[in-house]
Amino acid sequence: MTLIRIPLFPLPLVLFPHAILPLHIFEPRYKQMIRECVDTESRFGVILAGERGIAKIGCTAEVTEITRQFDDGRMDIKVEGRSPFEIESVVEEKPYYEANVRMLEDETDAKSAAIPEGLLEVYARCHILLFGSEPEEFDRENNESLAFAIAEDLPLDVEDKQTILASRDENDRLARLLPMLNQLIPQAEVRYRMRRKAGGNGHASV
């Protein structure tokens, strides 16, 4: 498969296709990177960075809006996740990292994947406990992966999110999600009780 070179933005989070991510760009190397991406209408790669280094699989991102620019070159932007990729090699020729990557496609049709029994009910319960409302109805025609949408929406452990992003089969992703959501319920119940005790009625801080 053909390799392409893209800039890398290591972050302590996982970006999914179709997800919107606000970013504050302040480091000189990333100000340069974002400016070059905007000027050339090109994408960069968001990759999970942790104590063990960077992950092998990430998601390309496209700048959709520059919401604020500062005199010193800092900027607030919004990006949208596009496509998963796998790093083949990292290149250090510029102030920021680049990588030769191959784009990843699902091995099966995500839209036709079977939804595990109980998954939507557990998802709705988590959402109500955490945010005080039912989740929005999922549009499977415009957003291919229900698993990506759920994993993006809820405060799952970042390693769990990375596991979902790395899978190339929607049936596998959905099957993996169900125990993750069941494990989230106790945490969601604690946050719900804290919100009730504080008298809040808005979104919980996650």
Task: Tell me what each language-model feature is.
Residues 1-206:
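N-terminal low-complexity, acidic/polar interaction/targeting segments
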